Every structure is written in structure tokens, then in C-alpha cells.
Design a protein with these regions (language model features):
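Nucleotidyltransferase catalytic core that binds NTPs
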Residues: 2-194
Length: 194
């Protein structure tokens, strides 16, 4: 074996081992929109792992009442909120992942989109079950005022002109305002019935 082959082999070995050594957690959400409960969950996860992979789920959906924001817009919301909260961004990966509508393939599809992770943080029963069946360590996250910090209720408040701005980081308020997100959501909620 020549020296170049040995170097390549050693590099591949080291990369693989460094990748495996990272204590990296996975956190999946749609973030429609990103709110203070999400921010607290990420802070909690980062106390338990070296790095976090934040998966922007349902990445292919946007411009509908349940998923009004694009994957790109959600990435911006998450990133700006983390930066404003002084979260060490060198410990964060944000990855958009489209839905796979076949549960037995979802975990392997997600693995293909993300860097290696060795622990999953989720309270959602199906997510927990799918990862446990794939031999992942799965931990629950402490809910942070779940009834108040809930994306569905935040979208409903946006639609009904109720106060929602205190439920999301200020950077998210500013970004949703910039992209005219409230009017988008209201337009999506309209019907053409007479």
C-alpha cells in the first residue's frame, strides 16, 4: 500500500471516528412558526449534548393554513432566534427534511439528510416509537408552558388578530412582519365561496 492510500485510509477512519465521537442530539419540528417553547427546548437539549441537529420537518410544504412558511423562511426564523438568544451556533445544524409518507422509511430517510446523531429528543409519540424501533436512544423534553407556546394556537391568534407577538422571539415577529406572514396566513384562510 503506497503512502497516499494509507493517508486516505487514515483520513476516512479518523473522519468516521470523529463523527461517531460527537454527542449529537436530534430535535424535529415544523416550526410554523418558531416560538419560545422551541427555543427553550433547544436550550435544554444543548445542556445534554455537544451539538444539536434541528430538523425543519415537512420541508416541502408552505403556503397552506397548517404550514404557511417555507422551509427557507423557517430556517431564517430559527437561526435569527438562536443568534439573538446567544446560542453558540457552532453547535447547531439546521436541516430541512421533506416528509416521507411511509413510516417504516422515515428514520432512514431522515438519516440521509442529516449529520450523524446518537440521541433523539422528542415528546411526539410516533416520532419516539419510530426512533426507538430503529435502536436510537430517545429522551423526552420538558414542555415549556405547552398550552401557551403552541404553533397551532399562535397561528389561530394571528388569524383572529389576537396578541401573538409575546409568544415568539422578537426576531421571529420582525421576520414574519418583513415577509408579510400575517396577511399570507389570512389570505390562505379565505375561501372563494360566495
Amino acid at each position: 500500500m503506497n503512502i497516499e492510500s494509507q493517508i486516505i485510509k487514515a483520513t476516512i477512519y479518523l473522519r468516521g471516528n470523529v463523527e461517531k465521537m460527537n454527542n449529537r442530539g436530534l430535535y424535529v419540528g415544523r416550526f410554523q412558526p418558531f416560538h419560545k417553547g422551541h427555543l427553550e427546548a433547544i436550550r435544554e437539549v444543548l445542556k445534554k449534548v455537544e451539538e444539536i441537529v434541528i430538523v425543519i420537518g415537512s420541508a416541502q410544504y408552505s403556503h397552506n393554513i397548517h404550514n404557511p412558511f417555507t422551509a427557507g423562511e423557517r430556517i431564517v426564523m430559527v437561526r435569527q432566534a438562536l443568534e439573538a438568544a446567544n446560542v453558540d451556533y457552532s453547535k447547531v445544524w439546521i436541516v430541512p427534511v421533506p416528509d416521507v409518507h411511509l413510516h417504516m422509511l422515515w428514520v432512514s430517510a431522515l438519516e440521509g439528510y442529516t449529520p450523524h446523531f446518537n440521541i433523539v429528543f422528542s415528546n411526539e409519540p410516533l416520532t419516539r416509537r419510530l426512533f426507538m424501533e430503529n435502536k436510537y436512544k430517545v429522551k423526552k423534553i420538558t414542555f415549556f408552558e405547552r398550552k401557551q407556546y403552541n404553533s397551532t394556537s399562535i397561528r389561530e391568534k394571528m388569524l383572529t388578530n389576537e396578541r401573538w407577538e409575546d409568544l415568539v422571539p422578537i426576531s421571529v415577529v420582525e421576520y414574519i412582519t418583513k415577509i408579510d406572514g400575517i396577511n399570507r396566513l389570512r389570505d390562505l384562510n379565505r375561501t372563494d365561496n360566495v
